Amino acid sequence: MHVLVLGSGQLARMMSLAGAPLNIQISAYDVGSGNVVHPLTQQVLGHGLENAIEQVDAITAEFEHIPHDVLDICELSGKFLPSTAAIKAGGDRRVEKALLDNAGVRNAKHYVIETREDFERAIEHVGIPMVLKSALGGYDGKGQWRLKEAAQIETIWAEMAECIAATPTQAIVAEEFVPFNREVSLVGARGKDGSVEVYPLAENVHTNGVLSLSTAIDAPELQAQAKQMFTAVADSLNYVGVLALEFFDVEGTLLVNEIAPRVHNSGHWTQQGAETCQFENHLRAVCGLPLGSTKLIRETSMVNILGEDTLPEALLAMDGCHIHWYGKEKREGRKMGHINVCGDYPGELHRRLCALAEVLDPMIFPAVHEFAKQAQR
């Protein structure tokens, strides 16, 4: 089997690594240059989307923000999975909110803003405090505002108006502020036959709006809620592939915050912690193969490496520590790689995370150090 991935970043890279044992070949389409590249070496293999489509058995995507004309060409080939509707929902918060409402899935009260009058109506409908997010292009905390009090209205509107004017068809989605206890996510896969397999929930810690630490957790009641909502969303889209739902945990009740129609950062722990990793299961799904087991085989946490291209060599000598570099050029705040930390018996993962904190810079890895502090109390 030969799969073309729209996008040539780290997710395509990790799909390639996961596909090799199954004899699934991966090529990546660089949306910016129009080149088809090898996802590991970035060697140019060809140019032009139409030629690439003819040479593969299936097409999928590693991110949501893909030009619609590219998606439409892929959809016409009959080889693209999941559907373009799913990708577009992940790339436009207006479509995403409508999808969640239509699927009957709990999410925060919301209102779409295109004009100053809409902003006033949103304040009346949603209330203050509220969170405001750009409908298009926002991710990892970008394109977001928090309206905490009426005194901020004029300043925030000026910034949002500039955002709306800068991009055709842009809008802002106002959401009710949700006082959540923690953020969790569910990554799962749906096959061509409608079968569903979900991984254990992961508890997520963000730093400046970017995921920094993700840990698989055992929470049966939350797991049941999350799986029900995952299935509702996936079935409504007739989804094929890996899908991620991000939730707010509000006193034991889950509300969907966002969906991601692709393999997801909070699922990277599955590379060492699950029977079948998310990347392999995505390829299994889009290639029409049976889904693999999502069973937890060891307690695992994932630590993002942000803006750094080196780590202390001591990590390589640590038991249960697995480093995954993405081969990227160093840039401040950029996701350069991740560390998976595993434990084989109760308490071992906590001990190893505390050991990790002793060798990692607290300014670069604050979430790991905060975890260690909490563990010592």
Swiss-Prot record:
Cellular component per GO, a single term: cytosol
InterPro entries xrefs: ATP-grasp (IPR011761), ATP-grasp_carboxylate-amine (IPR003135), ATP_grasp_subdomain_1 (IPR013815), PreATP-grasp_dom_sf (IPR016185), PurK (IPR005875), PurK_C (IPR040686), PurT/PurK_preATP-grasp (IPR054350), Rudment_hybrid_motif (IPR011054)
The keyword ATP-binding is annotated on this UniProt entry: yes
Uppermost EC category: ligase
Residues annotated to bind ATP: 93, 133, 138-144, 175-178, 183, 206, 257-258
Task of the protein: Catalyzes the ATP-dependent conversion of 5-aminoimidazole ribonucleotide (AIR) and HCO(3)(-) to N5-carboxyaminoimidazole ribonucleotide (N5-CAIR).
PANTHER family in alphabetical order: PHOSPHORIBOSYLAMINOIMIDAZOLE CARBOXYLASE, PURINE BIOSYNTHESIS PROTEIN 6/7, PUR6/7
Family to which the UniProt record says this protein belongs: Belongs to the PurK/PurT family.
Assembly and oligomerization: Homodimer.
Name of the protein: N5-carboxyaminoimidazole ribonucleotide synthase
Species of the source: Vibrio parahaemolyticus serotype O3:K6 (strain RIMD 2210633)
Gene: purK
